[in-house]
Amino acid sequence: IGFGRLTVRALVGLGCAAVLGWMALAIYYSPLQPAWLRAGLSALVPVGAAVALLLVRPLRWVLAGILGAFLVVLAAWLAIPPSNQRDWQPEVAVLPYADLHGDSITVHNVRNFAYRSETDFTPAYYAKTFDLRKLDRVDLIAVYWMGPAVAHVFLSFGFAGGDHLAVSIETRKEKGEGYSTLKGFFKQYELFYVVADERDVIR
């Protein structure tokens, strides 16, 4: 086998492994019930592919089967809807909204918690009207975690007179729910637009 053909086969093999891995995880973290069925179908992905590689010829039929299965799982994954009806953690329980009237915007449910610690706080919200003609600055703020290589960034809009309004896109977690980066790749969390007093998000 020439070097070029060997390289192509290696790339195809790596691509298939990546696709199979994604499919297995997408099924495992899907909302499919019961849980044992989800786990079984997830395990069936690599096992079925291995059996097909051993028994099915020509190999292009195996590749076609993997592609077909991938498209089915991808379509199901894309169809998973977000939900607004869950028992949310208090930090992300109240949705903000706004009314726009000409050059004025009234923002409701601006978060302004009184924090005693990261987990001990008193929820508080207010509504405020901003004159968009007085918007004079936009700050990009980075909050670093896991060292200097990873940061959460958000925007703070500054208005003449000293008013600031921060907007941060965050994970909307349920009560008792932790965070997993891996699960985050598979639609396990809704997203939430935190609209807050700048002092709420910069502490």
List each language-model region with its residue ranges:
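Internal/C-terminal transmembrane anchor helices
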Residues: L59-P82
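Juxtamembrane extramembrane loops of integral membrane proteins
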Residues: D103-S104, V110
